[in-house]
Regions:
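Alpha-helical transmembrane segments of multi-pass membrane transport proteins
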Residues: 1-434
Length: 434
């Protein structure tokens, strides 16, 4: 057995053991990387290299967008914007079976698109629509399952922090192209959940809402326009070359703050608390990005990506089977690992394999984000699943049975995105971004 392989086994073993015993993901990544580096190079050199990699990994202009988008999401979550989006969603989906559940899906797509956070969408929509569903006699497990199943769509529909992280790791991948590539897969996911929610609503006897008068509908849309304009301003500005994704994220913060103050949903004195919440989340993400840069360097030094690539290509050279294997791997990884560290660790491993048979890095990025987003609604570390159940006032054990059919239809959507590249690439190509 070669020294590189021995070091690779040490790294993987330490990482797995630390994760199993419940160590924080950042600590597990850092410890396993540090030990493996000391095994390869002198301790003083490994410490110096680690410091350099941490700085280099987090010293990226595009990553500055992450704290701003997180802050914008927190401001909107506290600023009355969610209520207006829910009212708009109720008008859009009011005539469908299980109208309140359908409006939950639409609202998650709208709020997630603005905030970029699936967990924030699940909390905001569950807290707003959940009580209305309970009042109308909806089963808690049904309403929670719909909320949980649709919340991750916000990680695919731009602006998306996960896509920004992927872009920084993959290198030379346009954030604007990734943003556009996420629209159709995100809408496909949301549409699939709506279809199944409607079928289940009919079986349960949940009726459509009464027809809303045109005047009321127009008033509701008018009230939601300022909130929806945020998407138009940010995405339109990025696509039009007016500003970068990073600059757009700062504009999103200013716009969301001004809008929330106009709505009088919070006061100036609330801003420090909201900023502190965003700073905590940003600190965790940046910490993991820096430590994951050490792991990426150590893996490249030991040749782990080549080993995995050779192992997969040794099983088959059929690209369709390879994509299926990658999907299975990412679904398993997403079940046990949060989205950001999974992107940081597995992008350097899997992207070269996909490039070897001609897969576009943008298509792979969407595939990666789609797979790992599914992990956010699966135990044991599904953040959106935990958030949705807590807000919905139910338990994971009771929701899982109702959630299983949604897993099935989301997996069908995943296969469509996997094997029909144009679902991801169409908008980016039409707009000349690739």
């Amino acid at each position: 057995m070669s020294i590189a392989l021995q070091v690779a086994l040490v790294m993987v073993t330490i990482l797995v053991v630390l994760l199993v015993i419940g160590a924080p993901i950042g600590v597990a990544i850092g410890m396993s990387s540090a030990v493996s580096m000391i095994c390869m190079i002198p301790a003083d050199v490994s410490f110096a290299t680690s410091a350099q990699r941490i700085f280099a990994g987090s010293n990226s202009f595009s990553l500055i967008a992450i704290p701003f988008f997180i802050l914008a999401g927190n401001i909107m979550n506290n600023g009355g914007i969610a209520t207006r989006l829910v009212n708009c969603a109720k008008v859009i989906s009011g005539r469908m079976p299980g109208a309140l559940a359908q409006s939950n899906v639409v609202a998650n797509m709208l709020f997630g698109a603005i905030s970029g956070s699936g967990a924030a969408a699940a909390a905001a929509m569950g807290g707003t629509i959940g009580p209305l569903e309970e009042k109308e006699g909806y089963d808690k497990n049904y309403s929670t399952a719909v909320n949980v199943a649709s919340a991750p769509v916000g990680m695919l529909i731009p602006p998306s922090n996960t896509m920004i992280v992927y872009s920084s790791v993959a290198g030379s991948v346009s954030i604007a192209a990734l943003f556009m590539a996420g629209y159709i897969p995100g809408i496909l996911w949301g549409g699939a959940v709506m279809i199944l929610a409607g079928i289940m609503a009919k079986k349960r006897g949940y009726q459509a809402e009464q027809r809303v008068p045109v005047k009321v509908a127009l008033k509701t849309f008018w009230q939601a326009i300022p909130s929806l304009l945020l998407i138009v301003i940010v995405i339109g500005g990025i696509l039009g070359g007016i500003f970068t994704a990073t600059e757009g994220s700062a504009i999103a913060v200013v716009y969301a703050t001004v809008l929330s103050l106009i709505y009088k949903a919070f006061k100036i004195k609330d801003i420090p608390r909201i900023v502190l919440e965003a700073a905590k989340t940003t600190g965790i993400i940046t910490f993991m990005i820096g430590l994951s840069s050490i792991m990426s360097w150590a893996m490249a030094f030991t040749g782990i990506p080549d080993m995995i690539a050779n192992a997969i290509l040794g099983l088959t050279t059929n690209k369709y089977l390879i994509l299926l294997l990658i999907n299975v791997l990412l679904l398993v990884v997403g079940t046990f690992m949060d989205v950001t560290p999974a992107i940081l660790i597995f992008t350097p491993i899997l992207l070269p394999i996909c490039k070897s048979f001609g897969m576009d890095p943008i298509h792979f990025g969407i595939l990666l984000c789609f797979n790992l987003s599914i992990g956010t609604i699966t135990p044991p570390v599904g953040t959106i699943l935990f958030t949705g159940c807590r807000v919905g006032g139910t338990t994971i054990e009771s929701v899982i049975k109702t959630l299983l059919p949604y897993f099935a239809i989301i997996l069908i959507a995943l296969l469509l995105v996997t094997y029909i590249p144009m679902l991801s690439m169409f908008l980016s190509k039409v707009l000349g971004l690739v």
